Amino acid sequence: MNTTVSGARIPIRPDDVVLAVLPFFHVYGLTSVLNICVRHACTMVLLPRFDAAAALDLVERHGITRISAVPTMLIGMVEDPDTGRDLSSVSQVVSGGSALPQEVLRRFEAKFPRATILEGYGLSESTSSVAVNVSREERRVMSIGKPLWGTECRVVDAEGHLLGPGEDQVGELLFRGPTIMKGYYRNPEATAATLVDGWLRTGDMGYRDEDGFIYVVDRKKELILRGGYNVYPREVEEVLYEHPDVV
């Protein structure tokens, strides 16, 4: 189901060549790379252990068109010093697993002249993606896009009350839909704490804008209370990445 709805949201063709750098034992690599390539009969080029230089060599050698990766991999490819490779075959990059700094997105798309980075979001408990941006024209930078087909999202406060749209309406992200797990194996207590009336509690803090795009602020556990203000590590990281002396 997840492979089908993900492929419908971000179209993939049989002539696509996908760089497989994510482990297949993880739900992200299993669903968004292996299963989607099998489902749509496209070519996969395997890289068993990630190395930025090796990944870029494969891009040039095989004419890679699509990459699914985590931000640390994209950072490695951006910072590789060899600028002589032809990377123009890459048209689409899906980033997930953690937040992608905006400065990294800018530098990556400058290095890969035809590439568009699309951020998405998912969990093992949701069998991978529940939301994703779909194109350069429609994406909202810093957002994880909109829910996939059949999936709903709501934002709630600490008491479980529904929050409306707006950057000042930060709460926990909850998802409900056909790809959400039935429960944890032989662990009814954990299941009851995570699934509430069919809604998956993600433990991630975020908000929605007026157009339905979802923004992840940070993990609920990582919120820092300082002088009456909510400080999220991701916001600090964004500022650091923009500083010219930070590599």
What does each model-identified segment do?
Residues 14-15, 90, 197:
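Phosphate-coordination loops involved in phosphoryl transfer and adenosine-cofactor binding
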Residues 59, 67, 177, 182-186, ...:
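AMP-binding/adenylate-forming catalytic core of the ANL superfamily
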Residues 97, 122, 145, 204, ...:
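Active-site glycine-centered loops adjacent to acidic/histidine catalytic or metal-binding residues
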Residues 142-148, 194-197:
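Short Gly/Pro-enriched turn/cap motifs at secondary-structure boundaries
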